[in-house]
Amino acid sequence: MEINTDKYKNITRNLEREMINLNPIQRGGILPTESKKIIYEYWDGYSVCDYCSGRLDRIETPPINEFLEDMSKFLGMDITRPTHGARESKYAVMNSICKEGDYVVLDGNAHYTSYVAIERAKLNYEKTDIGEYPTFRVIPESYAEKIDMLEDSKKNIGLILLTHVDGNYGNVADVEKVGKIAKSKGYPFLLNCAYSAGRMPIDGKKLNVDFIAASGHKSMAASGPCGLLSINKKYEDEVLETSKVNVVKELQMLGCTSRGIPILSLMASFERLIERVKKWDLELEKTRKVVNELEPLGFKQIGEKPRNHDIIRFETPILDEIAEKDKRRGFFFYEELKRRGLGGIRRGVTKEFKMSVYGLTNTQVDYVINSMKTIINELR
């Protein structure tokens, strides 16, 4: 068998080294320098298992067991387990506490992985209403309406799911209202915090949450794939049920999950997470500044106003107008940004785009704003 492996050698990526990355799916997952150092110690397969005591969450060296206890405090929950991502966390909950055919009531802004998890767990769903253009806010009262409708139809409800911050518009849902509805109706409540935990303060107990699904690589300065599932002790026996064959292994975790660099990078970044969520107001100031400075150019921010999250979605008719007369067509914006050391915006996009300045310095934010102003003013 002959296979040419030359294309797999010397694979490189220079986006983070040479450019300012504006991609909202990546801004929260950028590793600080101190976290990168740990990669050299744990890049071998199963290196975290040097002193394994039978299960990942019980490993003492490195102190994964203590880290998970501390993470529970950080999130305001009782018990935390590492997973491969928020999607796996959601599936673990659905597959353990719901019965086949049960309904999951979820918001209209839910991520596609919520639906995939529902389908994989052989469940049904009922989607709640959201506000109209241009805000698209989750309507908490719609949860009560959908629950009543399902109950009247004699449908079994297994779970209430809410996307804390959606990836399309960056809207922050009213968790407390939905949590009160779930509690009053007597249903378990799962909060998808893929875009929030690690970026902004989260306290599950204050929010009436039973489960938190978090993403290490999306919002907690960790390499991927890595996530967390935090639960209330009330659901420990159901969600963390162990195998009858190997009694130490938890079924929903398939024994062990993130057993390598991802979980170690998350641990190394933990101190940074604790500090950065305290500065969330400063992140919002930077985000709102971007919106206020760019809208006069002909950009229109979609989603709730003022911004309560770092994800910014712009409709950009002005870019469309420029693309019609520029010989580069829809690629001009990407190329002009790249020429100025800015990346993370999709190539060929002119009708709308998403961006984030999370974690950038004020000087960098000003540079981003001024660069976009220059591009528009020179080419319009």
Curated annotation (Swiss-Prot):
GO biological process, one term: translation
Molecular function in Gene Ontology: Sep-tRNA:Cys-tRNA synthase activity
Binding site for pyridoxal 5'-phosphate: 86-87, 192, 215-217
Reaction equation(s) it catalyzes: O-phospho-L-seryl-tRNA(Cys) + hydrogen sulfide + H(+) = L-cysteinyl-tRNA(Cys) + phosphate
Keywords: Protein biosynthesis, Pyridoxal phosphate, Transferase
Protein biosynthesis as UniProt keyword: yes
InterPro entries: PyrdxlP-dep_Trfase, PyrdxlP-dep_Trfase_major, PyrdxlP-dep_Trfase_small, Sep_Cys-tRNA_synth_arc, SepSecS/SepCysS
Top-level taxon of the source organism: Archaea
EC number(s) on file: 2.5.1.73
Residue numbers of N6-(pyridoxal phosphate)lysine PTMs: 218
Main enzyme class: transferase
Cofactor requirement: pyridoxal 5'-phosphate
Family the entry assigns: Belongs to the SepCysS family.
Function: Converts O-phospho-L-seryl-tRNA(Cys) (Sep-tRNA(Cys)) to L-cysteinyl-tRNA(Cys) (Cys-tRNA(Cys)).
Self-association state and partner proteins as the record states: Homodimer. Interacts with SepRS.
Protein name (Swiss-Prot/TrEMBL): O-phospho-L-seryl-tRNA:Cys-tRNA synthase
Species in which this protein is naturally found: Methanococcus maripaludis (strain C5 / ATCC BAA-1333)
